[in-house]
Amino acid sequence: MNVAHSLSEKPVILCLHFSGGTWQAWHGIFPHFSADYSVIAPDMRGHGKSEKPESGYHIEEMADDIILLLNELGIECCHIIGSSMGAEVGLSIAASHPEMVQSLVCEGGLYDRWGEYSLLEGTKEEAEIERTELLASIYNEKELVYSSAEEYLSSMKGEFKEAKIWNRHTETFIRSTMEQKVNGHFANRFTKNVLAGFISSCWDIRLEDYYCKISCPVLFLPSQEESENRLAEKSIQHFSSLIREHYITYIPDSLHAYVWLQFPFQAADAVISFYKSFKSGRLSS
């Protein structure tokens, strides 16, 4: 497993990136934690420079990878910050190994993929149609290949500028997603097989089954869109009722998964305020 870390005697923060991400998704927030914390940021299974097996993309399998990594590094306990998929993996770790997790930040893991606590309104049969169509669209999507690194970066820059999240942190992240093929062309390291494997493995997961097993404080960090969605609000309220200590906040104009690149100072500040709140006993519950 490819991993970046700066270990010392300081408390440890483990950063778990979103689907399609790399450890460089956290590039913007590292400086905000370096004074008081050690930071570990791996490329999770199927991502970045880590191995890309054909299977094993259930959140519990990816959680097992991370637990092995922590054991190898001699980390007995840590704070976890998870983004989208990474939040679900972090949640799985907190549920199966509560003694290892001091706190959990969930910028993701806020709702199921279908069912009562999801953003899909409809029957199980309609949800299955949604899943089938989603997987078909992934498998049918043509891989984008570029003749040069500059062409790859230019294309990605256009997409990120359109989303209004282009900055030096996103540029560093985008460079980390690029790899050169045997034929000399450039493409994204993240493959559709990995994405489809993750969606297939995790479609029926009920996140409430994990939340009810954790014992650490949780910060829910929905995006602006999620904070304004009544179904997301319903789900977050239900999940928060299953845990002993929680806090809910959001950053204005934030985008799901990309807030750490988009507003690194505000995102890091939200996490640090959360840490101070539960240490002083002022955490909402």
Question: What would you call each of these model-derived segments?
Answer:
Residues 254-264:
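Catalytic histidine-centered segment of alpha/beta-hydrolase-like enzymes
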